[in-house]
A protein has these predicted regions:
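Conserved phosphate-binding/catalytic loop of the ribokinase/pfkB sugar-kinase fold
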Residues: 91-92, 102-143
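Glycine-rich phosphate/adenosyl-contacting loop at the front of the ribokinase-like
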Residues: 1-65, 70-74, 81, 243-244
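Conserved phosphate-binding/catalytic region of the ribokinase-like
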Residues: 1-9, 34, 201-314
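Active-site glycine-rich loop that binds ribose-phosphate moieties when present
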Residues: 120-129, 147, 166-173
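Conserved phosphate/ATP/ADP-binding segment of small-molecule kinases
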Residues: 150-236
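A glycine-rich helix N-cap at a beta->alpha junction
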Residues: 80-94
Length: 314
Protein backbone atom coordinates (compact mmCIF):
# COMPACT_ATOMS: atom_id res chain seq x y z
CA UNK A 1 0.00 0.00 0.00
CA UNK A 2 1.42 3.38 -1.01
CA UNK A 3 1.56 5.82 1.90
CA UNK A 4 2.39 8.92 -0.13
CA UNK A 5 2.19 10.21 -3.67
CA UNK A 6 4.81 11.92 -5.78
CA UNK A 7 4.88 14.58 -8.43
CA UNK A 8 7.46 12.69 -10.50
CA UNK A 9 8.36 9.01 -10.27
CA UNK A 10 11.60 8.13 -12.04
CA UNK A 11 12.42 4.64 -13.27
CA UNK A 12 15.71 4.46 -15.11
CA UNK A 13 19.47 4.81 -15.03
CA UNK A 14 21.65 6.22 -12.26
CA UNK A 15 25.42 6.32 -12.04
CA UNK A 16 28.46 7.58 -10.18
CA UNK A 17 30.66 9.84 -12.29
CA UNK A 18 34.33 10.59 -11.68
CA UNK A 19 35.28 13.75 -13.57
CA UNK A 20 38.87 14.51 -14.56
CA UNK A 21 39.57 18.02 -15.84
CA UNK A 22 42.57 18.30 -18.15
CA UNK A 23 44.21 21.34 -19.78
CA UNK A 24 43.90 22.09 -23.48
CA UNK A 25 42.03 19.60 -25.62
CA UNK A 26 41.48 15.87 -25.21
CA UNK A 27 44.88 14.12 -24.80
CA UNK A 28 46.42 12.31 -27.76
CA UNK A 29 47.14 8.58 -27.58
CA UNK A 30 50.23 7.41 -25.66
CA UNK A 31 50.74 10.71 -23.84
CA UNK A 32 50.90 11.73 -20.19
CA UNK A 33 48.59 14.56 -19.12
CA UNK A 34 48.36 16.49 -15.88
CA UNK A 35 44.93 16.54 -14.25
CA UNK A 36 43.83 20.02 -13.19
CA UNK A 37 41.18 18.75 -10.78
CA UNK A 38 39.09 15.70 -9.91
CA UNK A 39 35.50 15.49 -8.75
CA UNK A 40 32.93 12.79 -8.00
CA UNK A 41 29.24 13.40 -8.60
CA UNK A 42 26.21 11.25 -9.21
CA UNK A 43 24.72 11.07 -12.69
CA UNK A 44 22.60 8.97 -15.00
CA UNK A 45 19.75 10.09 -17.24
CA UNK A 46 16.92 9.54 -14.79
CA UNK A 47 19.02 10.20 -11.70
CA UNK A 48 20.10 13.66 -12.84
CA UNK A 49 16.63 14.54 -14.14
CA UNK A 50 15.10 13.74 -10.75
CA UNK A 51 17.65 15.85 -8.89
CA UNK A 52 16.94 18.75 -11.26
CA UNK A 53 13.19 18.44 -10.76
CA UNK A 54 13.59 18.19 -6.99
CA UNK A 55 15.70 21.35 -6.82
CA UNK A 56 12.97 23.12 -8.77
CA UNK A 57 10.39 22.16 -6.17
CA UNK A 58 8.89 18.90 -7.43
CA UNK A 59 8.28 15.98 -5.08
CA UNK A 60 10.34 13.20 -6.63
CA UNK A 61 10.85 9.49 -6.09
CA UNK A 62 13.20 6.97 -7.69
CA UNK A 63 12.00 3.40 -8.22
CA UNK A 64 14.66 2.03 -10.54
CA UNK A 65 17.15 -0.67 -9.65
CA UNK A 66 19.81 -0.13 -7.00
CA UNK A 67 22.51 -2.58 -6.00
CA UNK A 68 24.18 -3.39 -2.70
CA UNK A 69 27.59 -2.10 -3.83
CA UNK A 70 29.47 1.01 -2.74
CA UNK A 71 28.45 3.00 -5.81
CA UNK A 72 24.77 2.25 -5.17
CA UNK A 73 25.18 3.49 -1.60
CA UNK A 74 26.66 6.72 -2.95
CA UNK A 75 23.63 7.11 -5.22
CA UNK A 76 21.26 6.44 -2.31
CA UNK A 77 22.96 9.02 -0.11
CA UNK A 78 22.83 11.59 -2.88
CA UNK A 79 19.12 11.03 -3.50
CA UNK A 80 18.36 11.37 0.20
CA UNK A 81 20.41 14.56 0.38
CA UNK A 82 18.41 15.97 -2.54
CA UNK A 83 15.06 14.97 -1.03
CA UNK A 84 14.32 12.23 -3.58
CA UNK A 85 12.39 9.31 -2.08
CA UNK A 86 13.99 5.89 -2.67
CA UNK A 87 11.69 3.74 -0.53
CA UNK A 88 10.25 1.99 -3.60
CA UNK A 89 13.57 1.31 -5.36
CA UNK A 90 14.21 -2.46 -5.63
CA UNK A 91 17.64 -3.65 -4.44
CA UNK A 92 19.45 -6.51 -6.14
CA UNK A 93 22.94 -7.96 -5.89
CA UNK A 94 23.15 -8.18 -9.68
CA UNK A 95 22.37 -4.48 -10.16
CA UNK A 96 25.46 -2.49 -9.14
CA UNK A 97 25.30 1.18 -10.05
CA UNK A 98 27.16 2.02 -13.28
CA UNK A 99 30.43 3.91 -12.92
CA UNK A 100 31.74 6.46 -15.41
CA UNK A 101 34.99 8.34 -15.86
CA UNK A 102 34.48 11.61 -17.70
CA UNK A 103 37.43 13.50 -19.18
CA UNK A 104 36.63 17.20 -19.54
CA UNK A 105 38.96 19.32 -21.69
CA UNK A 106 39.31 22.85 -20.30
CA UNK A 107 40.10 24.61 -23.58
CA UNK A 108 37.59 23.00 -25.91
CA UNK A 109 34.97 22.45 -23.17
CA UNK A 110 34.29 19.01 -24.61
CA UNK A 111 34.06 15.71 -22.77
CA UNK A 112 34.68 12.03 -23.35
CA UNK A 113 32.77 9.50 -21.26
CA UNK A 114 34.04 6.03 -20.36
CA UNK A 115 31.49 3.92 -18.52
CA UNK A 116 31.17 0.45 -17.06
CA UNK A 117 27.98 -1.56 -16.56
CA UNK A 118 28.36 -4.83 -14.67
CA UNK A 119 24.76 -5.98 -14.31
CA UNK A 120 21.13 -4.97 -14.57
CA UNK A 121 20.34 -1.26 -14.62
CA UNK A 122 17.28 0.91 -14.96
CA UNK A 123 13.78 -0.47 -14.55
CA UNK A 124 13.08 -3.82 -12.94
CA UNK A 125 10.77 -6.16 -14.89
CA UNK A 126 8.16 -6.44 -12.10
CA UNK A 127 8.81 -3.62 -9.64
CA UNK A 128 7.75 -1.16 -8.37
CA UNK A 129 4.21 -2.23 -7.61
CA UNK A 130 1.57 -0.92 -9.98
CA UNK A 131 0.08 1.16 -7.16
CA UNK A 132 3.36 3.08 -6.82
CA UNK A 133 3.26 4.07 -10.49
CA UNK A 134 -0.38 5.08 -10.22
CA UNK A 135 0.47 7.31 -7.24
CA UNK A 136 2.66 9.57 -9.39
CA UNK A 137 1.52 12.61 -11.34
CA UNK A 138 4.25 12.10 -13.96
CA UNK A 139 6.28 9.01 -14.87
CA UNK A 140 9.84 9.71 -15.96
CA UNK A 141 11.90 7.01 -17.62
CA UNK A 142 14.71 6.23 -20.05
CA UNK A 143 15.32 3.11 -22.13
CA UNK A 144 17.38 1.17 -19.57
CA UNK A 145 15.60 -1.99 -18.43
CA UNK A 146 13.35 -2.07 -21.49
CA UNK A 147 10.83 -4.63 -20.23
CA UNK A 148 10.36 -2.72 -16.99
CA UNK A 149 10.11 0.60 -18.83
CA UNK A 150 7.41 -0.79 -21.11
CA UNK A 151 5.50 -2.21 -18.15
CA UNK A 152 5.63 1.11 -16.28
CA UNK A 153 4.71 3.16 -19.35
CA UNK A 154 1.70 0.94 -20.10
CA UNK A 155 0.48 1.26 -16.50
CA UNK A 156 0.88 5.03 -16.69
CA UNK A 157 -0.91 5.24 -20.05
CA UNK A 158 -3.85 3.20 -18.71
CA UNK A 159 -4.03 5.47 -15.65
CA UNK A 160 -3.83 8.69 -17.67
CA UNK A 161 -0.46 9.62 -16.17
CA UNK A 162 1.81 11.57 -18.56
CA UNK A 163 5.11 9.93 -19.46
CA UNK A 164 8.25 12.03 -19.99
CA UNK A 165 11.35 10.25 -21.29
CA UNK A 166 15.07 10.80 -21.79
CA UNK A 167 16.46 8.50 -24.49
CA UNK A 168 20.00 8.00 -25.78
CA UNK A 169 19.79 4.60 -27.51
CA UNK A 170 17.28 3.25 -30.03
CA UNK A 171 18.92 -0.10 -30.81
CA UNK A 172 16.57 -2.25 -28.72
CA UNK A 173 13.91 -3.88 -30.96
CA UNK A 174 11.16 -2.73 -28.58
CA UNK A 175 12.25 0.91 -28.59
CA UNK A 176 9.59 2.00 -31.15
CA UNK A 177 6.90 0.53 -28.90
CA UNK A 178 8.24 2.44 -25.90
CA UNK A 179 8.48 5.68 -27.89
CA UNK A 180 4.78 5.45 -28.77
CA UNK A 181 3.94 5.31 -25.05
CA UNK A 182 5.72 8.60 -24.30
CA UNK A 183 3.49 11.67 -24.06
CA UNK A 184 6.26 14.26 -23.89
CA UNK A 185 9.13 13.32 -26.20
CA UNK A 186 12.24 15.40 -25.46
CA UNK A 187 15.22 14.42 -27.61
CA UNK A 188 18.60 15.86 -28.60
CA UNK A 189 18.85 16.73 -32.28
CA UNK A 190 21.45 14.10 -33.23
CA UNK A 191 19.41 11.29 -31.68
CA UNK A 192 16.17 12.56 -33.22
CA UNK A 193 17.87 12.77 -36.61
CA UNK A 194 19.01 9.18 -36.25
CA UNK A 195 15.55 7.78 -35.58
CA UNK A 196 13.74 9.91 -38.18
CA UNK A 197 16.25 10.25 -41.02
CA UNK A 198 15.42 13.97 -41.17
CA UNK A 199 17.87 16.85 -40.76
CA UNK A 200 16.31 20.24 -39.96
CA UNK A 201 15.05 20.58 -36.35
CA UNK A 202 11.56 21.65 -37.43
CA UNK A 203 11.20 18.68 -39.75
CA UNK A 204 12.67 16.33 -37.17
CA UNK A 205 10.17 17.48 -34.54
CA UNK A 206 7.24 16.83 -36.87
CA UNK A 207 8.65 13.42 -37.81
CA UNK A 208 8.95 12.38 -34.15
CA UNK A 209 5.33 13.32 -33.45
CA UNK A 210 2.82 10.51 -33.02
CA UNK A 211 -0.92 10.56 -32.42
CA UNK A 212 -0.66 10.05 -28.65
CA UNK A 213 1.89 12.84 -28.15
CA UNK A 214 1.26 15.88 -26.01
CA UNK A 215 4.52 17.54 -27.03
CA UNK A 216 7.77 17.01 -28.90
CA UNK A 217 10.91 18.98 -28.03
CA UNK A 218 14.15 18.76 -30.02
CA UNK A 219 17.14 20.25 -28.20
CA UNK A 220 20.03 21.70 -30.19
CA UNK A 221 22.56 23.02 -27.67
CA UNK A 222 23.42 26.68 -28.18
CA UNK A 223 21.01 26.77 -31.14
CA UNK A 224 18.13 26.38 -28.68
CA UNK A 225 15.14 24.06 -28.98
CA UNK A 226 12.32 23.47 -31.42
CA UNK A 227 9.03 22.24 -30.00
CA UNK A 228 5.44 21.59 -30.95
CA UNK A 229 2.25 20.70 -29.16
CA UNK A 230 -1.25 19.65 -30.12
CA UNK A 231 -1.70 22.67 -32.40
CA UNK A 232 1.01 21.28 -34.70
CA UNK A 233 2.92 24.58 -34.84
CA UNK A 234 6.70 24.27 -34.45
CA UNK A 235 8.18 27.02 -32.27
CA UNK A 236 11.74 27.95 -31.32
CA UNK A 237 13.21 28.70 -27.89
CA UNK A 238 16.67 30.32 -28.15
CA UNK A 239 19.40 29.19 -25.78
CA UNK A 240 20.55 31.65 -23.13
CA UNK A 241 24.09 32.93 -23.28
CA UNK A 242 26.11 31.75 -20.29
CA UNK A 243 29.78 31.25 -19.50
CA UNK A 244 29.77 27.50 -20.05
CA UNK A 245 32.50 25.33 -18.55
CA UNK A 246 31.05 21.80 -18.83
CA UNK A 247 28.03 20.42 -20.68
CA UNK A 248 27.93 17.15 -18.69
CA UNK A 249 24.34 16.46 -17.65
CA UNK A 250 22.82 19.48 -19.39
CA UNK A 251 20.42 17.36 -21.42
CA UNK A 252 19.30 15.41 -18.35
CA UNK A 253 18.78 18.66 -16.43
CA UNK A 254 16.68 19.97 -19.32
CA UNK A 255 14.47 16.88 -19.08
CA UNK A 256 14.06 17.15 -15.32
CA UNK A 257 13.29 20.86 -15.41
CA UNK A 258 10.77 20.31 -18.20
CA UNK A 259 9.02 17.66 -16.10
CA UNK A 260 9.03 19.99 -13.08
CA UNK A 261 7.41 22.76 -15.11
CA UNK A 262 4.85 20.32 -16.45
CA UNK A 263 3.82 19.04 -13.04
CA UNK A 264 3.56 22.62 -11.78
CA UNK A 265 1.03 23.44 -14.49
CA UNK A 266 3.17 25.55 -16.83
CA UNK A 267 2.20 25.69 -20.53
CA UNK A 268 4.49 24.05 -23.07
CA UNK A 269 6.45 27.17 -24.01
CA UNK A 270 7.13 27.98 -20.36
CA UNK A 271 8.22 24.40 -19.64
CA UNK A 272 10.75 24.68 -22.47
CA UNK A 273 11.90 28.12 -21.29
CA UNK A 274 12.36 26.87 -17.73
CA UNK A 275 14.27 23.83 -18.96
CA UNK A 276 16.47 25.97 -21.20
CA UNK A 277 17.40 28.24 -18.30
CA UNK A 278 18.09 25.37 -15.90
CA UNK A 279 20.30 23.54 -18.41
CA UNK A 280 22.18 26.74 -19.22
CA UNK A 281 22.88 27.50 -15.57
CA UNK A 282 24.08 23.93 -15.02
CA UNK A 283 26.62 24.41 -17.81
CA UNK A 284 28.32 27.17 -15.82
CA UNK A 285 29.60 24.63 -13.30
CA UNK A 286 31.47 21.34 -13.81
CA UNK A 287 29.85 17.94 -13.45
CA UNK A 288 26.37 16.66 -14.03
CA UNK A 289 24.59 17.59 -10.80
CA UNK A 290 26.42 20.06 -8.57
CA UNK A 291 25.57 22.99 -10.82
CA UNK A 292 21.85 22.23 -11.08
CA UNK A 293 20.04 25.44 -10.06
CA UNK A 294 17.24 25.91 -7.56
CA UNK A 295 13.87 27.41 -8.43
CA UNK A 296 14.95 30.76 -6.97
CA UNK A 297 18.15 30.80 -9.01
CA UNK A 298 16.27 30.07 -12.23
CA UNK A 299 13.65 32.72 -11.53
CA UNK A 300 16.30 35.33 -10.75
CA UNK A 301 18.18 34.42 -13.93
CA UNK A 302 15.07 34.73 -16.11
CA UNK A 303 14.09 37.99 -14.40
CA UNK A 304 17.46 39.45 -15.39
CA UNK A 305 16.36 39.34 -19.05
CA UNK A 306 19.33 37.18 -20.10
CA UNK A 307 20.78 37.49 -23.58
CA UNK A 308 20.08 34.68 -26.03
CA UNK A 309 21.84 33.32 -29.05
CA UNK A 310 20.32 34.45 -32.33
CA UNK A 311 17.91 32.10 -34.04
CA UNK A 312 19.98 30.27 -36.68
CA UNK A 313 18.88 29.66 -40.23
CA UNK A 314 17.83 26.06 -40.89
Amino acid sequence: MVKSSFDILGIGCVSVDDLLFVPGSYPAADTKTRVLSWDRQCGGLTGTALVAAARLGARCAFAGLLGVDDFSRIVEENFLLEGVDISHAPRAKDAPAPHAVIIVAAETRTRNIFYRIDGRIGADDRLPDESVIRAARILFLDQYGMNGCLRAAKIARAAGIPVVADFEDSDHPQFPELLRLVDHVVLPLDFAQKITGETAPETVAKAVWHQDCQAVVVTCGTAGSWFLGKDGVVRHQPAFKVLAVDSTGCGDVFHGAYAAGLVQGAPLDQCVRLATAAAGLKATQPGGQRGIPTRTQVEEFLASNPETYGSPKT
